[in-house]
Amino acid sequence: MAPVAGKKAKKGILERLNAGEVVIGDGGFVFALEKRGYVKAGPWTPEAAVEHPEAVRQLHREFLRAGSNVMQTFTFYASEDKLENRGNYVAEKISGQKVNEAACDIARQVADEGDALVAGGVSQTPSYLSCKSEVEVKKIFRQQLEVFMKKNVDFLIAEYFEHVEEAVWAVEALKASGKPVAATMCIGPEGDLHGVPPGECAVRLVKAGASIVGVNCHFDPSVSLQTVKLMKEGLEAARLKAYLMSQPLAYHTPDCGKQGFIDLPEFPFGLEPRVATRWDIQKYAREAYNLGVRYIGGCCGFEPYHIRAIAEELAPERGFLPPASEKHGSWGSGLDMHTKPWIRARARKEYWQNLRIASGRPYNPSMSRPDAWGVTKGAAELMQQKEATTEQQLRELFEKQKFKSAQ
């Protein structure tokens, strides 16, 4: 397709990575928009793209200004089966097609305000958890893919998969489009929920057709990079080549179990004390780069200022700062303009690097005990349903939680 007159054609995702460029992803939309009052915690579905497009558009713009050069469509959990799961009924009230189309239109509009690409994204499905067949699950992915092709997204992402089997199905469905495919799993160093190690997960994803592989969500930057390192080693052992990608949480989760932060008792409404600072994220960006990761972004908890931290840390490699850095002094240097002298004394890198941050909660523990129910595909509690969760089903879960907590 010829470029529009007067507009310079953008380099594609693989062209950028082949040239050695650092690609910066965006942050966590469902958490950010839930805090702002546009997404409902629980289903975490993206109907805000239709109901509140201005809110979604503004968040895209803030990530773009912060340094993101990929606008992921706000299509996380936008599969038909998720939009009608457990009494949600979004698919009936709005339709999955409208949600996906609106998300693509918003992402494209903002991407074209800068040098950003649009990535159409799919994620794990209730159908897989309910033991539906490969044919049925792939059909769900193809429904979203039809919209992505119609809207001509630049590349595709299969993200947030706990089971490599389903992730492979997603990659295979997306790869049929002919567009580049990235694939990220929400796993830690222990591997997927069926016990498949990270290295083997990466190998399977690349063999399925993914050009970019890595992790997103569920774990903090440190743990996520441990997992990416294992993926890298697996690919090297298999003599396979792929670009590496990392989009972790912006929460510290050293105490979580195999299922990541969703196992923590603070999930999702008590995570604020765990939020990573901008300086934590600068450290993450440097460590990711040194590991060989060239697609670096974030997931839940990542706000625009976190993305700006990535862009600022990697400005020497990228050759420029993002527009949002106009209002941010490097390592707190802008504090030299403060009225209070003890605040001016904090206008230096050494202060912020060495600060041991207090929580302000004197009687609270620093770590939690994960719930760790250990359920995965095939477990009765994970069988999904179109109807709303019943009071009886909730009572049974409440009793099980009491039992687990007492162990």
Curated annotation (Swiss-Prot):
Q: Which cofactor does it need?
A: Zn(2+)
GO biological process terms, alphabetically, are: amino-acid betaine catabolic process; methionine biosynthetic process; methylation
The EC number(s) this enzyme carries: 2.1.1.5
Recorded superkingdom: Eukaryota
- Name any GO cellular component annotation: cytosol
Domain Hcy-binding, residue spans: 11-314
Please state where this protein is localized: Cytoplasm, Cytosol; Nucleus
- The keyword Transmembrane appears for this protein: no
Provide the positions where the record notes the PTM N6-succinyllysine: 40, 93, 98, 232, 241, 340, 377
Cofactor detail note: Binds 1 zinc ion per subunit.
**Primary localization:** cytoplasm
Catalytic activity reported: L-homocysteine + glycine betaine = N,N-dimethylglycine + L-methionine
Per the record, residues carrying Phosphoserine are 330
Q: Which Pfam families match?
A: S-methyl_trans
Claim: Methyltransferase is one of the keywords in the record:
yes
Keywords linked to the UniProt accession: Cytoplasm, Metal-binding, Methyltransferase, Nucleus, Phosphoprotein, Transferase, Zinc
Supply the InterPro entries for this chain. Betaine-hCys_S-MeTrfase_BHMT (IPR017226), BHMT (IPR051524), HCY_dom (IPR003726), HCY_dom_sf (IPR036589)
- The main enzyme category here is transferase
Q: Cite a single GO MF annotation.
A: zinc ion binding
Q: Which residues bind Zn(2+)?
A: 217, 299-300
Q: What does this protein do?
A: Involved in the regulation of homocysteine metabolism. Converts betaine and homocysteine to dimethylglycine and methionine, respectively. This reaction is also required for the irreversible oxidation of choline.
* Oligomer and partners: Homotetramer.
The name this protein carries in UniProt is: Betaine--homocysteine S-methyltransferase 1
Species of origin: Mus musculus (Mouse)
